[in-house]
């Protein structure tokens, strides 16, 4: 059962402002330097502020307390949930465990587990329940439009290099989780598990505004690679397709340059041809 109110949560010792630390490996100074010549200064300012202070998820409406039941899949795969929570807490991206709710407006959504293509399972937070009163219901999708790169975009780039163009791919790992959320919105991303309470502090999958918000950072990386480092690429969210001339080391050099830039900015990557 999902989205059932379990009663008004009772706060215990509250989370202090001093505990509201932003968690992201992304290096503000590197982005500031690399984006210094970007023409859209307001956008750059927003991006840098997001790295320093976290991004707003765009929720409109009151932050009211609510507790939702976890999905059946969570009880069917408890080790998955426990392991994922422990990993995220250790990484500093999830706060907890708390014996009592950490904020008066704490709102928990249902935890669940879903299978991945590699046969493993992954933890999810069901932010679209309860219907009509969920976190996602409070985020207007028209405020967060996203336009993905298409196959035609990739074909156009490849065609510029002609027959025999060399392709490679660089993936940003745990990409959404690199983007921190502003502390004012942490109470919207609550979880409860085995009698304890947790709060997410980084972009989760399933949040309505997450693809748009993450893509702003991916677009920044794309601009940096193309403008400052002469890397020819097209990206679809966290996947970057890099193209080089046939019979030359351009593609390999571009991959290495991409990995160097990502390392300086502190993106986690996996690259392969």
Place the predicted regions along the sequence by residue.
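Short, conserved secondary-structure transition motifs
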Residues: 159, 163-165, 177, 243-246, ...
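Reverse-transcribing Pol proteins
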Residues: 1-142, 235-237
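Short, flexible/disordered secondary-structure transition segments
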Residues: 96, 228-232, 251, 268-273
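Catalytic-core region of right-hand nucleic acid polymerases
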Residues: 72, 80-215, 261-264
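Short amphipathic alpha-helices and their capping/turn residues within compact interaction modules
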Residues: 90-93, 116, 223-226, 230, ...
